[in-house]
Amino acid sequence: MRWRHTFQTRIAGVLALLLLVVVAAVYFAVKTATNRAVENQAQVQLETGSQVFERLLDLRGRRLQYGLNWLTADLPFRQAVAEGEPAAILAALRRHGTGLTSSEVFVLGLDGQVMVSTLQALTPGQAFPYNDALRQARRSGLQMLIVALDGRPFLLVQQEVVDPAPIARVAMGFPMDEVFASELRSMSNLEVSFISVQHGQPGELFSTQPEAFQASIASGLQAPYINPVAQLNLFHGQRYLSQVLPLGNTADGGEVRVLLQSPLDHALESFAPLDRQFLAIALVVLLVSLAGGGFFGTRGNAPPQSPG
């Protein structure tokens, strides 16, 4: 009968619609769970990267301090400092070989005036900009400082020159530049960017991100207020979990800001084959269910055969 055919067709349609809703709900639930898993993974990666960054800074500081202790214990260097002649001090540094390749050396008088500097931005007779911070760090037992010098971030350590009483103080600075950022990236799988801000003036940006991205990174790191909490954001069409670490412990207008970025899209790509397989299976199940519903609906509508 026609009403029976219409009823069974409606039942088949309702069942197909319900199945479609269930399949879609399961698919989007899996998709949401995948996104959350990737975000959690990125959060763990970001936290691990922050710890790696701190340990790498500590390791660099210890190495720097070891080299500085070796330098200040060198007799020819102490004699050159006692004489107070910049040329003799530089000659002793060249013979010693410490601090002339990847680090900068600052020999300071007890009054905080620069005697010798391998950084051209600081000249003899000039007051060292972080002299008070060095004194405060020494009193408080702080092993290293993170400062902004000549528009660049530096990791700074210090040691006195004694002969036998203190006659000078030597500071040695390790630049946090592209090489350091690349090393941190290789250890943490994070994108890393550094910028120094001194008295409100930003310095040069050092970043592992492509050059086309660096202008927007520098602009973001120069914001007057920095939120240190990790945030999800869209950056040049790609999703990142980002965190800004404000560094600098001198309280005299110098600050170093570090941007750590954990890419989400790259992690999501690893789940893309699983999503496609699940979607294909769901479509096959839906098509089979529709075909089965149509088949049984046709069987139910077939007229009964009369007995022979």
Which residue stretches match the model-derived regions?
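Short, hydrophobic beta-strand elements of compact beta-sandwich sensory domains
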Residues: 166-175, 242-271
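Juxtamembrane extracytoplasmic/periplasmic/luminal helical "stalk" adjacent to the first N-terminal
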Residues: 7-13, 18-83, 100-103, 145, ...
